[in-house]
């Protein structure tokens, strides 16, 4: 510790990030504002958001599919969903589980009606208007625990089909709480 020094670096203003995204990367003004808010003062995160749009869109669609299938208790389709995820590869599976954790957190906070605390894209916000009431103080901890457990199992090389099917079955119970 004798040769270390701490530097506090402040966040970059959202307007500065949005302007830079518009000028340097040709991002539309509305999109640049959303990306700047999602980046939370981190320009590198803003650039990653631009480049990871396709993967995030896939994860968003898979998340919606899981939540709808779990709510409707469609077991056969949930099995197909888990097989689709199992074919992705371990890193993408872990990224998907991290995305799910973020979405559960954002939907839980959405219930507080504090827009400045939410970091969701416009399609995610549209979905949250209908889905957020199902994420509440009775089930949010259980959902996050199951997501963490699934991520640990994926990291430990457990069969992905089993992990995701088990997780989807547990979501049936958790969403009804």
Q: What is each stretch, according to the model?
A:
Residues 1-99, 103, 110-177:
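Charged, glycine-rich active-site and insertion segments that engage polyanionic ligands
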